[in-house]
Amino acid sequence: MVSFASDYIAGAHPAVLKKLVDTNLETLTGYGTDEYCASAAEKIKKACELGADADVYFISGGTQTNQIVISTMLKGYEGVICADTGHINAHEAGAIEYFGVKALPLKGEAGKITAAAVDEYCKTFYGDDNHEHMVFPGMVYISFPTEYGTIYSKKELSDLYEVCKKHDMKLFIDGARLAYGIESKASDVKLRDIATLCDVFYIGGTKCGALCGEAVVFTGGCCPKHFVNLIKKRGALLAKGRLLGVQFDALFTDDLYTEIGRYAIDMAEKLKRIFADKGYRFFLESPTNQQFVILDNKKLKELEKQVSFGFWEKYSDTETVVRFATSWSTTEEDLKYLESII
């Protein structure tokens, strides 16, 4: 069945898979100390225009990455501010709470939180005479793009980062779908901007062409000591770290990572036009690879027998919001088929 259920329904981009096959019989050191991990890290630093004080580590998945970064960067009395719809708050099974970190959710707007809202939260917190009895805000977590496919502007990121510095907090950007954010035609943010407007972020591989894996980037001087030890303690250090290094080495060769993002955006725009031309309504305006369509429940039942897509939320008693996602594996034939059945 043709599927638009997510951007990780297929395996790896052919160029990534070829690199894995071509290097398969090479004997390499373990735990991320191999030459491909080193090469990928240097390519990422170059793409981000970061210096020698930046640090890059590879972790197998997004939830592990969020949990490790957040739990190792915060002190025991600190929590993390996030949107109420943020992945760490809504869809990670309490992973950060499992390690003793409280999520401090703020009401988001289409998945985004504002610098003003964060600033007000912190002012209210420190203005409370009882704040020593409360969880301190120690970090702000955002996603780029958000769970709703929306993106922050460069000014919005800059304002958030300034508020974080004002209140002595770290800014962490979840880049699970980073390729689609930086390559969106509506975005004025590029990889180098991400690298200068936060303390730590990660470059998503799993949802952007890799079999699995994310690349954590500490932008300079704030990487926790003995980070490899901390990754292993949390059960997330691969013995065959080459699996991640080889993939990211391929993704950051000849601009493959951004090419994957551009292609998925092009497919998403075509998908969006197909629905719009047929008179369908959208839940919100998404400039990235995730499109949120409002379906009549009867039509939903018909379509789900013919094509895969993701449930998002109930819209009314008779309508539902569903998500259609594109990726490197989406084809023109997939779109033509979709057009023929909706």
Feature map (PLM): residue ranges:
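Conserved core of the PLP fold type I
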Residues: 54-74, 104-111
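Conserved PLP-anchoring active-site segment centered on the Schiff-base-forming lysine
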Residues: 72-90, 119
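PLP-dependent aminotransferase-class I/II
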Residues: 100-138, 142-147, 152-159
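Active-site C-terminal subdomain of aminotransferase-like
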Residues: 109-110, 136-137, 143, 151, ...
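Catalytic PLP-binding core of fold-type I/II PLP enzymes
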Residues: 152-184
